[in-house]
Amino acid sequence: MTPGVVHTLSDRVRRLVAPNPGPMTGPGTNTYLIGSGNNVAILDPGPAIDSHIEAIVDACAGKASQVVCTHTHPDHSPAAAILAQRLNVPMIGAVTADDRHQDLTFQPDIDLSDADLIEGDGWTLCAIATPGHVDNHYCYLLQEEGLVFAGDHIMNGSTVVIVPPGGSMQAYIASLRKLLDYDVAAVAPGHGEIIPDCRGEVEKLVRHRLMREHKVMSGLRKVGPANLDALVVVVYDDVDPALHEWAKLSMLAHLIKLQSEGSAAVQQDIWQAVGS
């Protein structure tokens, strides 16, 4: 996946990869161009990197109909306001409270609701509210192809980090299962290559999250009342310790879910299991 190179996925969809590779972004953020001519939706324009913005403008020949974002993390939406102004098109998406992880430059002209339709010449995107990774996250189903643009709801090659309070493990698992209610064949993730089997991927991710939740409970019982630093070593013993600071965020999301279900309790940042 080479930054700046347009990759044609179908008659309706092209992809550009932003030059922002890293542990959390994989090969870089995927920007998708849906449609052709004057009816091009720019989906997840990515970070405000000049070379990437120019590549997007060149790929759509300076013409677009809207800029659409899955969510407002800094690797997905900062280029939106720049492109919207330059191409004189509206921004579409949703905002959330500032939790120090959001792109505050994204102020949509059209604020989405679940099941809203975005339509162009020969294509229709159905907005699917998928809170979890963050509470303003949306996926977009290209109805003509059964292809869902998943942002950070589903990534190829890794699981996504859930960061409370904007992120919720309980909501994330429910939102994964929600995709199974739609006629989805494949996943176009925010990072990485196309995933051809949406149902199989969703089922795998749900199993993984529930397995990790089981390890959280086992860890609580093994080490007794403990803080996040003590727990992460046990719960994420299969993860590179260099990533444990990120892992603690998802683990906290698991703990909050367990607390809401009456299986864990916390006092002064010390967590413990509740019941048998």
Task: List PLM regions with ranges.
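Metallo-beta-lactamase
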Residues: 39-42, 47-49, 117, 124-219
